[in-house]
């Protein structure tokens, strides 16, 4: 932790003795810089280019040292566009890694990768900054308490419950609902959550970032009248940013979250959308730095880069960071190196299925692919565990019977199997749920369902008490009482039509 009340910029530390170099080569977002003998900067040091281009426009580009090439030359990756830079321009070595503002002054504001506010609300009033590169907490500092984090989403709470202070991954291909699910989790958890939240937008759509900001202002998570009372800090490095910014914006968000955990001793929520873009940016940078690509063209340092980010997201005896990360799955292939490397670090995985999304079942969470280390009788209790296992067994049996149904039809199944299929189809629909953040699209009001209500609903379906109700009564409802009420309404409507 460093306090530098003298600097206006959060990036550059005090530069009494300037260590100056000159640009020798520019290849897109990568710069080669020559320094005087014996004055070489360290790896991860921030370099700043302050100059004017040919038409007199001010240039202010920050880079990060990635390689020491020899012959007094270093290779650095730019955190913003390199337009207007020329060979021979002066480069200042700041003598320290990128540092960003941390603490209460960051709440309610939007930052870029350098920790500069980008919301047009004036400068951030903070004197406390922290470097984005830090080591993970020591093993002895870690907290090992196990407790459930209730989300109000039926399929998550029942089949793959989240751990308080754990790491959670939302896996899915393009357009199956990762961002909507992460928005709903922000809505359900961040609003009811007493602590603070940090949202890292890594390489995703600018429009979604803007929507989230507006949504948070409307809901009061960001307090416009008194910004200091806000509960969230936003850090964006969107799709249009250079790979250097997308590669480091996750670390900027994490650094802000770590301060709340370690210094303020708070419980923090860290949302990252999307962790795949962090890997993708690392892959782009790796190729630009001339490293030999590894499997499927990814960087050879994939596991190391992922580990250095994920190991810092943890709970210590001071406070906790509960992290929810969206993970894009290229071509719906979960064995792709990027999602496969992420799996190893997570306590719970929520896998979104294109098949369910095509059926119109939202959230399209696959009940069989989603997993959680918390689903154990000693943690969640016997009743919850037994119900979850029976739901999974029924879903698995239905999946096995689908080929037979497709070829021979339902009538060729045994009585027992027909009953299993009917209950599985009801459960599949009951796992859907109207979301608060999707109200404007669906026209249905959002529903928050407590864990006890969720367990009761599935027990009633499994016991056979609701076998007489139609399937559509279970679609997009909250608790089981709404399903029975919907069934009665459907019955009345059908009688009126006759």
Swiss-Prot record:
The keyword Transport applies. It is a peripheral membrane protein. PROSITE patterns: ATPASE_ALPHA_BETA. The keyword ATP-binding applies. Pfam families: ATP-synt_ab, ATP-synt_ab_N, ATP-synt_VA_C. GO terms for molecular function: ATP binding; ATP hydrolysis activity; proton-transporting ATP synthase activity, rotational mechanism. It comes from the Eukaryota. GO terms for cellular component: chloroplast thylakoid membrane; mitochondrion; proton-transporting ATP synthase complex. CDD domains: ATP-synt_F1_beta_C, ATP-synt_F1_beta_N, F1-ATPase_beta_CD. ATP binds at residues 172-179. One of its GO terms (biological process) is proton motive force-driven mitochondrial ATP synthesis. Belongs to the ATPase alpha/beta chains family. HAMAP family: ATP_synth_beta_bact. F-type ATPases have 2 components, CF(1) - the catalytic core - and CF(0) - the membrane proton channel. CF(1) has five subunits: alpha(3), beta(3), gamma(1), delta(1), epsilon(1). CF(0) has four main subunits: a(1), b(1), b'(1) and c(9-12). Produces ATP from ADP in the presence of a proton gradient across the membrane. The catalytic sites are hosted primarily by the beta subunits. This is ATP synthase subunit beta, chloroplastic.
């Amino acid at each position: 932790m460093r306090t530098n009340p003298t600097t206006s910029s959060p990036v550059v530390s005090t530069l009494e003795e300037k260590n100056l170099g000159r640009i020798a080569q520019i290849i897109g977002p990568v710069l080669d810089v020559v320094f005087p003998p014996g004055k070489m900067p360290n790896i991860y040091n921030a370099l700043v280019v302050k100059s004017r281009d040919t038409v007199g426009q001010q240039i202010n580009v920050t880079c990060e040292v990635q390689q020491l090439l020899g012959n007094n030359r270093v290779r650095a990756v730019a955190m913003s566009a390199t337009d207007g830079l020329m060979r021979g321009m002066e480069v200042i070595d700041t003598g320290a890694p990128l540092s960003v503002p941390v603490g209460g002054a960051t709440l309610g504001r939007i930052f870029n990768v350098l920790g500069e506010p980008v919301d047009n609300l004036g400068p951030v009033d903070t004197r406390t900054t922290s470097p984005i590169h830090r080591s993970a907490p020591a093993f002895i500092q870690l907290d090992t308490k196990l407790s459930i984090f209730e989300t109000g989403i039926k399929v998550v709470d029942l089949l793959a419950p989240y751990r308080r202070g754990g790491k959670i991954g939302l896996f899915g291909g393009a357009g199956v609902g990762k961002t909507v699910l992460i928005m709903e989790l922000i809505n359900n958890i961040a609003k009811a959550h007493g602590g603070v939240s940090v949202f890292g937008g890594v390489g995703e759509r600018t429009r979604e970032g803007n929507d989230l900001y507006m949504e948070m202002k409307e809901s009061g998570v960001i307090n416009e009248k008194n910004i200091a009372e806000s509960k969230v800090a936003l850090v964006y490095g969107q799709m249009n940013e250079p790979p250097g910014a997308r590669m480091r914006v996750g670390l900027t968000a994490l650094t802000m979250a770590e301060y709340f955990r370690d210094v303020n001793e708070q419980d923090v929520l860290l949302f990252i959308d999307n962790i795949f873009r962090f890997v993708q940016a690392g892959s782009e940078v790796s190729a630009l730095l001339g490293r030999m690509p590894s499997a499927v063209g990814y960087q050879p340092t994939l596991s190391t880069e992922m580990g250095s980010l994920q190991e810092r997201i943890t709970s210590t005896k001071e406070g906790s960071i509960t992290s929810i990360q969206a993970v894009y799955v290229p071509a719906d292939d979960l064995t792709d190196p990027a999602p496969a490397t992420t799996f190893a670090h997570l306590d719970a995985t929520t896998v979104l299925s294109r098949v369910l999304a095509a059926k119109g079942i939202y959230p399209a969470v696959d009940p069989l692919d989603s997993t959680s280390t918390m689903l154990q009788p000693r943690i969640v209790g016997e009743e919850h565990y037994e119900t979850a296992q029976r739901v999974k067994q029924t879903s698995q049996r239905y999946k096995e019977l689908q080929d037979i149904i497709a070829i021979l039809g339902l009538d060729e199944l045994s009585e027992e199997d027909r009953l299993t299929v009917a209950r599985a189809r009801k459960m599949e629909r009951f796992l859907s749920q109207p979301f608060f953040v999707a109200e404007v699209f669906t026209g249905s009001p959002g529903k928050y369902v407590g864990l006890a209500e969720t367990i009761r609903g599935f027990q009633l379906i499994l016991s056979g008490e609701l076998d007489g109700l139609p399937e559509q009564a279970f679609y997009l409802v909250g608790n089981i009482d709404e399903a029975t009420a919907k069934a009665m309404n459907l019955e009345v409507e059908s009688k009126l039509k006759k």
